[in-house]
Every structure is written in C-alpha cells, then in structure tokens.
Amino acid sequence: MTVNTENNRLTASFGGARLIVEPWGESSVRVRMYPALCDIAEDERLSSSPYYSALTEQVSHNCTIRSEEVDTTDPWYKGDEYAQYHQTGTDYYLTNGKLTVKLDNEGRMSFYNQRGEVLTEEYWRDRNRINRYCVPLRIVARELKPRQGGTDYEITVRFEAYDNEKIFGMG
C-alpha cells in the first residue's frame, strides 16, 4: 500500500484501487474510492463549486494528518524468533474537528470521536492475519466492481455493527 498525505487528504493506492479521505465540513470527512487507472481530475466536479470551496476553507485550519509506526510482527514470535521475523508498518490518522479517521498499515479504516472511542470500523473477515478474525470467507470491507456495459463502477462498503449505533448521511 502506498499512502500520500498532500493537500490535507490521505490518498492510498492498493489492490488496483485508490482511496481518498479528505475533510468535508466541520467534524466530517469525505471518502472516495476509484479504480487505480481512473484519472481523478476528471471526477473533481465538486471542486469547482463555491460550496466545495467554502467547505475546504472552513476546515483547512482544523485538519491534521499524522503517521505512527506500529509493530506488525505476529504475536506468537518470542525472543530470537521475534528479532528474526520483526516487521513494522505505518498507521495514518486524519483528524478534522472532533472526528479522526485511522487508515492502518493494511488499509483498514476506522473512525473515532474526540475522546478516542471507536464510532465505527470497516468489516473485514479474511485469513491475512491469524491473530484477528480468521475465517475462510474472505469478506472485504470495500468491493469495487465495474458495471456491465459502461464505464461506471459500483462500490459495496461494509462496517461493523454495534449496539445502539446511529449512522447518518451514508448513501
């Protein structure tokens, strides 16, 4: 995964897709996903509108991006084996007002409030890391599929379900 942190936004490229997370109003973000070969400049329709300019100017001073190096070594390695198989990765955080988006070293997104409590996170079930949910279903949180007979794409996004959750503005 390759991550770029320019222009107050996170841009991650991986698996034939490009993910963009950017501030969008006060304490909110806009998340977009494109096929890797798609030219994003062609799809920046909102960027020329006065509404977009007002949104980006309003949050430009409230948005911060930071990165943190994390240990990704599997937990069963101890002692000399740990040193031999030691790995690190980088987690990225975009904070806009009271909302923080974490993009971890494997490309998984999670959303936190100002107190650091998880609001929601993407629903991934695969066999990539055995110390997490390890199921043979290979359910990914984001699927980008081309629509038959055209140049458009359809995206399916999955999030974890929590008791008493309230999610607004998706769709």
Region locations from a protein language model:
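N-terminal accessory segment at the very beginning of proteins
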Residues: M1-G171
